[in-house]
């Protein structure tokens, strides 16, 4: 059911990686998970205008390392690195351990699903027509080399009394294929009529890393099985 399941969770361990990397036992797991949620909520609000896409949290021994993926690193770092030092202290208070923050720049924000969804949501809040916002976003993403894009918008569109879902797609987006490199993002637009959800799927091509090794292993196994087979007439008595 590739259409129903979360595209990132479906591909974890295959072509996608976890955004929280740590190990915990017992009650520590719930505490770590809650702290991760608090940190992400805090950074999303604090860096609302910095085009932050993803926040990765790692917990080595007696510390924490946070990587912020953003299209506008200058806003996060601040003048002479002042803002990032303040962020370290505030995040360290939430986690209760020494924290380091790394910044990763997103070179092409048009190919990042969350940033595309967030851009559409902000346009909807400015009362831009939803079809125009969808088509503009899809066109700019396809122009930069995406194989396929799908955008879905749900809610009281144009202030309608009954909520509905509208979607627009260009290219192909194979949700069932595990090796397909599909980026998925969700954003919300808060309008006077209510909340409108924006979902974006971007297909960037097939991830073939490790595929050649797997096929070579299967070929070796098939050769071994073929050699083990006995000829049909081996068990027959010679007349």
Curated annotation (Swiss-Prot):
Keywords: Ribonucleoprotein, Ribosomal protein, RNA-binding, rRNA-binding
GO BP annotations listed: translation
Domain KH type-2: 39-107
GO MF: mRNA binding; rRNA binding; structural constituent of ribosome
SUPFAM superfamilies: Prokaryotic type KH domain (KH-domain type II) (SSF54814), Ribosomal protein S3 C-terminal domain (SSF54821)
UniProt region (Disordered), positions on chain: 215-239
Residues in the signal sequence: none
Basic residues biased stretches: 227-239
Family matches, as Pfam families: KH_2, Ribosomal_S3_C
Any single GO CC term annotated in Swiss-Prot or TrEMBL for this entry: cytosolic small ribosomal subunit
Annotated family: Belongs to the universal ribosomal protein uS3 family.
Subunit structure: Part of the 30S ribosomal subunit. Forms a tight complex with proteins S10 and S14.
Described purpose of this protein according to its UniProt entry: Binds the lower part of the 30S subunit head. Binds mRNA in the 70S ribosome, positioning it for translation.
Protein name: Small ribosomal subunit protein uS3
Organism (species): Dichelobacter nodosus (strain VCS1703A)
